[in-house]
Curated annotation (Swiss-Prot):
Locations listed in the record: Plastid, Chloroplast thylakoid membrane
UniProt-recorded name of the protein: Photosystem I assembly protein Ycf3
Keywords, sorted A to Z: Chloroplast, Membrane, Photosynthesis, Plastid, Repeat, Thylakoid, TPR repeat
UniProt organism field: Sorghum bicolor (Sorghum)
Membrane topology: Peripheral membrane protein
Family membership noted in the UniProt record: Belongs to the Ycf3 family.
Swiss-Prot/TrEMBL TPR repeat ranges: 35-70, 74-107, 122-155
Gene: ycf3
GO CC entries: chloroplast thylakoid membrane
């Protein structure tokens, strides 16, 4: 069973108390309550940057097993992708971002993170002297950034600038 993590931070404490009260009064199944508990505990650990990603992943994996709502699952899968990104496990991260987007195609942050990974891989290919592979990665990054920007036009200004500079997208 996950342990509740409430530190001395007033906002964290308040959020945890409110979440626990809502969990008790909102009509939900026991499986949904358990999924939320695992999700909340995983999210709290991640947000507090305790560095215990293995435990956070265990909570998120358990939450995905218990959570049936596709929208809620999308955020759990997205957060798993974040941990894999932080750990430098880019292939796994991409897999979880894809899975999140299958359930919720309106996650611009997932598209952005996928673009960042592809852009990084393009830069790595350049360092290895493979410009053809680099261009393929950069093109893929551009496609993901276009999707993120389409969902939230006022965001991702650096990505928009990169797309303009590299002539991968024209903005009005």
């Amino acid at each position: 069973m996950p342990r509740s993590r409430i530190n001395g931070n007033f906002i964290d404490k308040t959020s945890s108390i409110v979440a626990n009260i809502l969990l008790q009064i909102i009509p939900t199944t026991s499986g949904e309550k358990r999924a939320f508990t695992y999700y909340r505990d995983g999210a709290i650990m991640l947000a507090q940057s305790e560095g215990n990603y293995a435990e956070a992943l265990q909570n998120y994996y358990e939450a995905t097993r218990l959570e049936i709502d596709p929208y809620d699952r999308s955020y759990i899968l997205y957060n798993i992708g974040l941990i894999h990104t932080s750990n430098g496990e880019h292939t796994k991260a991409l897999e979880y971002y894809f899975r999140a987007l299958e359930r919720n195609p309106f996650l611009p942050q997932a598209f952005n993170n996928m673009a960042v990974i592809c852009h990084y891989r393009g830069e790595q290919a350049i360092l290895q002297g493979d410009s053809e592979i680099a261009e393929a990665w950069f093109d893929q990054a551009a496609e993901y950034w276009k999707q993120a920007i389409a969902l939230t036009p006022g965001n991702y200004i650096e990505a928009q600038n990169w797309l303009k500079i590299t002539k991968r997208f024209e903005f009005e």
